[in-house]
Amino acid sequence: EVNQVLSELKQDYKIAILSNSEPDIIRFNIAKIGVAFDEVVLASEAKCYKPSAGMFNELIKRLNECPKNITHIAQSFYHDMRTAKDLGFGRRIWINRYKKQGDLSYKPDAEISDMRRLHEHL
């Protein structure tokens, strides 16, 4: 479902990757997905790892957007939802495939089990 949903999103939105993964892994995954991302921010470039605000600030800078205009969509509650909220991202959508428990004080704007329901929350 990931490839299809990202292709659809790309028609109307800028899309970016914010990842702690190694560059070779990300390049492989991007090629497999087959979607042109507007930005790719890696920990190796930002010189820090999520959940560090440095990663998110690098994304904000590259997108040239105010945080309130950014929707952050992620699978990791710990690595993504807290920092996105602390930095004032406009919307935070948690893809909770495994029905994990998140921190209620950092409750996302939406919680979905897979990306097919993403359009309902944008």
Go through the PLM ranges and name each one.
Residues 7, 16-122:
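Asp-based, Mg2+/Mn2+-dependent phosphohydrolase catalytic module
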Residues 1-12:
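Catalytic-core regions built around general acid/base machinery
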